């Protein structure tokens, strides 16, 4: 590094000395700006630096050096404890680390964003309307607030808890998830629920009825649902095979047709025994102890449970008019499709069936 010459250093010192001398001898046109009176501090209001920026006399607030070492101004940006300050301190409406009101950072303010216990704070604390991990009202995080989104027990909360109108895993009212709420969509036993349960006006499959008529948990419901799926897959496979060999069965003798129908219906009724009987249900219902070739009509009427406007499969003496074919000439109600024990109201063009239809 090249050093300065003695001439350059002497010139700098001379200029500095002349500047100080001339500054002391200059006549100022504005006495308010050049005097040591109180008005010198007016220009220090709202400053950006290390002084309070408050209009005070030197006697009231001390000298300038003492005030510069402190950091307590109003609306100051830096290090201190001001009001509406951005930095490190404990101000009001401050952004940084402190305990202010409406502060953004790590503290316990009101309407603060960070870590603390404020009101309407975003972060970790126990505020009102806070977003983070705490116990506020209308908070988003992990806590027990009202109208909170997270894991807790609030009202109208979205997460894992037991609130009212909650979306998640719990037992709330009007909840969407796995629980037992009212108007719930999922797995549970609610009212007006869409899923797998025992509700009123439910769309789905009923769970297996127990002896104590108790509610089943999600694990049991899952197993029941898997069994129902297997039954449906088996029935679909059987239907596909029957459709593939439909021409052969129609060309075969009526005796062979009766055997095929008997085997199919026996499997169908065994699968029905594990299903339930809801109200106004659309689908298939079980008929406990149902016999296909019952000659006694009273036995059939005693076995079948009385249901109101239920669309199901199986014969029912006390039911609404059904459209189909029956070998035992009993009435089924308003059912469109195939039934066990022979397809009724179908068009079987075998000679024996044509003669039977004409004799009727």
Swiss-Prot record:
The modification Phenylalanine amide is found at residues 77, 86, 95, 104, 113, 122, 131, 140, 149, 158, 167, 176, 185, 194, 203, 282, 336. The modification Tyrosine amide is found at residue 323. Keywords: Amidation, Cleavage on pair of basic residues, Neuropeptide, Repeat, Secreted, Signal. It comes from the Eukaryota. InterPro entries: FMRFamid-related_peptide-like, FMRFamide-related_np, Serralysin-like_metalloprot_C. The keyword Lipoprotein does not apply. It is found in: Secreted. SDPFLRF-amide inhibits neurons. This is FMRFamide-related neuropeptides.
């Amino acid at each position: 590094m090249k050093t300065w010459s003695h001439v350059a250093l002497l010139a700098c010192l001379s200029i500095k000395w002349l500047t100080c001398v001339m500054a002391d001898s200059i006549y100022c046109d504005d006495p308010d700006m050049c005097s040591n009176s109180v008005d010198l501090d007016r220009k220090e209001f709202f400053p950006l630096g290390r002084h309070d920026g408050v209009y005070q006399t030197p006697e009231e607030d001390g000298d300038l050096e003492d005030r510069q070492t402190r950091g307590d101004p109003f609306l100051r940006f830096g290090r201190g404890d001001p009001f509406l300050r951005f930095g490190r301190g404990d101000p009001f409406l401050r952004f940084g680390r402190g305990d202010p009101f409406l502060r953004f950072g790590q503290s316990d303010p009101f309407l603060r964003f960070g870590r603390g216990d404020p009101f309407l704070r975003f972060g970790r604390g126990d505020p009102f309307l806070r977003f983070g991990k705490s116990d506020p009202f209308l908070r988003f995080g992990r806590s027990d607030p009202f109208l909170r989104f997270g894991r807790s027990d609030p009202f109208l909360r979205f997460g894992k808890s037991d609130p009212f109108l909650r979306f998640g895993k719990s037992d709330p009212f009007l909840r969407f998830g796995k629980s037992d709420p009212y108007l719930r969509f999922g797995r549970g036993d609610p009212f007006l629920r869409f899923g797998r349960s025992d509700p009123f006006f439910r769309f789905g499959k009923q769970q297996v009825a127990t002896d104590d008529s108790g509610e089943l948990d999600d694990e049991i419901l899952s197993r029941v649902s898997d069994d129902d799926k297997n039954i449906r897959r088996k029935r679909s496979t059987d239907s596909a095979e029957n459709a593939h060999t439909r021409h052969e069965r129609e060309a075969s003798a009526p005796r062979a047709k009766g055997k095929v129908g008997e085997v199919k219906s026996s499997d169908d009724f065994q699968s029905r025994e594990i299903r339930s009987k809801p109200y106004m249900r659309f689908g298939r219902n079980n008929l406990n102890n149902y016999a296909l070739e019952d000659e006694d009509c009273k036995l059939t009427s005693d076995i079948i449970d009385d249901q109101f406007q239920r669309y199901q499969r199986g014969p029912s003496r006390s039911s609404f008019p059904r459209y189909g074919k029956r070998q035992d000439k009993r009435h089924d109600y308003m059912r469109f499709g195939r039934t066990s024990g022979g397809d009724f109201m179908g068009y079987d063009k075998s000679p024996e069936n044509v003669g039977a239809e004409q004799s009727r």
